[in-house]
Amino acid sequence: MTKMIDISAMPAELSEKNTLTARRLGIDTHEHAVIYMRADCHICRAEGFNNHARIKVSGPSNKAIIATLNLVVTDLLSPGQIGLSETAWLRLQLNEGDPVRLIHPAPLLSLSAVRAKIFGEPLDQNNLDAIVGDIAAGRFSDIHLSAFLTASAAHEQSFEEIRDLTLSMVNVGQRLDWGRAPIVDKHCVGGLPGNRTTPIVVAICVAAGLTMPKTSSRAITSPAGTADTMETLAPVELDVSAMRRVVETVGGCIVWGGAVALSPVDDTLIRIERALDIDSDGQLVASVLSKKIAAGATHLVIDMPVGPTAKVRTEEAAARLEGLFARVGSNLGLNLKIMRTDGSQPVGRGIGPALEAWDVLAVLNNEGHNVPDLTVQATLLAGELLEMGQAAPAGRGAELATELLVNGRAWRAFEAICEAQGGFREPPTAPHYQVIQSPRDGVVGRIDNRRLAKAAKLAGAPASKAAGIVLHAKLGSQMVKGQPLYSLHSQSLGELSYAHDYLASQPEIIEIEEEQCPR
């Protein structure tokens, strides 16, 4: 007869057999928690741990993580040692030589819901709560995450699924309550180089007396995110308490969302979406709205650029996405307005963190004639928020936004935000640049946003803050052969050469068309 064993009643000395001594290997595995064990380790044999197994690891601080196992077949580790990647080491808060305990994690029950989605079945709130909870706890490997995102993209998510996913993502993170209303916010769907309206919009709204706690992302696939650009002007890595202090002091902020962890699962999903190049409508809506709800927003304007090389390419796609945003947002209590904008070309002159920051400063310092498109875009978006927040009469928002720029109040509000976040600083400039000239006489007829953004990244953006591209011409500009078309800016000559070689192979990134003579 088989004898049942109560595992919970096992003596402590048995659990100690699953303990190894920690060694910091200094291996950067990005966001992956990875552990390293000898292939002949007695625990691997006893527990049946194989390469890439998912293992629950805990240390003396009582913190525990789920990590991926890599087996070592050399003498990198001594018998009785376990190596840890930087991510695993820091999450467990270990010291060299600490005892580390290893056990099998609990079964991943939410995978049954992922399998259901793979076969096209809809997921309910309980399914999504379980999946999102396991993602937040680090129980999903990248393979599991990829399966969930791919299935969600392949089988269109219903309104109910998108709404429930949004709520699940909000509920696993912090949710801010500012104790007052309205709390205004904005988001840009993206896909357009430049277009750095957020710092200007926040400054205008704060100058008008509205509260705007803006959390922004770093670049995912673009040459710059709002957080990257703002970081060239002031610190952005503030925790929730520091963010709250800034907002209570000056009325608004522009901080990196990753530091405040308001929708932590979203950052994990975005990392996988970037690798897979997947950006489904349902996931986009849940991503945006979960962060806005978690930040305490009550009124939201969404900038949706539409153009042949933008993220949203057709009016039909824009209408579909707009409908999803409006329905889900309204159902979750958000006062939301979508503004479709021109996505046929970059907004502003700079593409890259510091170059976009210089555009922002030009607008705020009443030099917007240098970037008129950015000035108009920012005042339209800010004007809509001013009207929604009842800081301006209906139909007068853009006028008031322009007035706040001209009289300097928006600039003073921006300065106050920068000082409250740690101090204003001037954006850097790149030591190397090269001007690309128009190859012929004519008119700028088309700009490929995607390939222009790729060139800016090859020049070093966003990792090199001063790198990127400055446009010297826009759609409709009359060009003479040899006239500056755009310039490349890089931190190193190697990156400059790399980007230039790419541009030389892509002469149609900015197309110069022959000017049609009137008959």
From Swiss-Prot:
It is an enzyme of class 2 (transferase). SUPFAM superfamilies: Nucleoside phosphorylase/phosphoribosyltransferase catalytic domain, Nucleoside phosphorylase/phosphoribosyltransferase N-terminal domain, Pyrimidine nucleoside phosphorylase C-terminal domain. Pfam families: Glycos_trans_3N, Glycos_transf_3, PYNP_C. GO terms for molecular function: 1,4-alpha-oligoglucan phosphorylase activity; thymidine phosphorylase activity. Its EC number is 2.4.2.4. Keywords: Glycosyltransferase, Transferase. PROSITE patterns: THYMID_PHOSPHORYLASE (PS00647). GO terms for cellular component: cytosol. One of its GO terms (biological process) is pyrimidine nucleoside metabolic process. It catalyses: thymidine + phosphate = 2-deoxy-alpha-D-ribose 1-phosphate + thymine. Belongs to the thymidine/pyrimidine-nucleoside phosphorylase family. Type 2 subfamily. NCBIfam families: ARCH_P_rylase (TIGR02645), PRK04350.1 (NF003338). This is Putative thymidine phosphorylase. It comes from Maricaulis maris (strain MCS10).
